[in-house]
Amino acid sequence: MNEIVLFDTSVLIDNQRTACHSERMADCPGRIRNSSVVLAELWRGATVAAERQFVKTLEESRPVLTPSEKNWLESGLILAAIRADKGFEPAKLRDLHFDVLIALTARSHGATLITSNRADFELIRRYRRFELEIW
C-alpha cells in the first residue's frame, strides 16, 4: 500500500451506515486524504442533518486532493475509450466519470484508492493503472 490513501465514496457510505470498515480504517497505514470528488458525491447525497455533519467533519479532518486540469482532460479520453470498447450509453458514462476522476487523482498523487466498487474501478484500471484495494 502507498503512503497516501484515498477512500472511495462506497467505503465511506458503507462505513457510515454499518460501521463495517471502522476497524480497518482505524488500522489503515499511511496518510489518509480526502478526494474533493468523493466529498462532492457525499454532499450531493446528504439528506439529513447527521449525514451533512458526517460530511462536514470528514471535509475538515484531512487535506483534500482535487483533480487537476490534466486529470479532467484525461478522464474524457478514458471515457471515450470505454464507450468505444464497451458501447456504454451516455448515462453509464456519466455515472463512471466521477470514479475516473477519483482514480486519476489517486494516481497523480501516488495514492492507493480503497473502494468496495470492484466492477467500475477494475474497469477503469484496464485503461489507466493506479493502486487499488478492494474492501
Predicted features and spans:
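Alpha-helix capping/helix-boundary segments
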Residues: V11-L12, V38, N71, I102, ...
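Short, hinge-like loop/turn segments at secondary-structure boundaries
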Residues: A49-Q53, I82-R83, E131-I134
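Active-site neighborhoods of divalent-metal-dependent phosphate/nucleic-acid chemistry enzymes
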Residues: V64-S116
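Phosphate- and divalent-cation-binding pockets in alpha/beta enzyme and binding domains
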Residues: E41-L42, E74, L123
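Acidic, PIN/NYN-like endoribonuclease modules and their adjacent C-terminal/linker elements
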Residues: N2-I4, A103, R107-W135
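Histidine- and aromatic-rich ligand-binding microenvironments
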Residues: F7-D8, N34-S35, R94-L96, N117-R118, ...
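Short, well-structured N-terminal submotif of metal-dependent ribonuclease cores
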Residues: M1-R62
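Residue-level signal for well-ordered alpha-helical positions
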Residues: T18-A19, G45, I78, I124-Y127
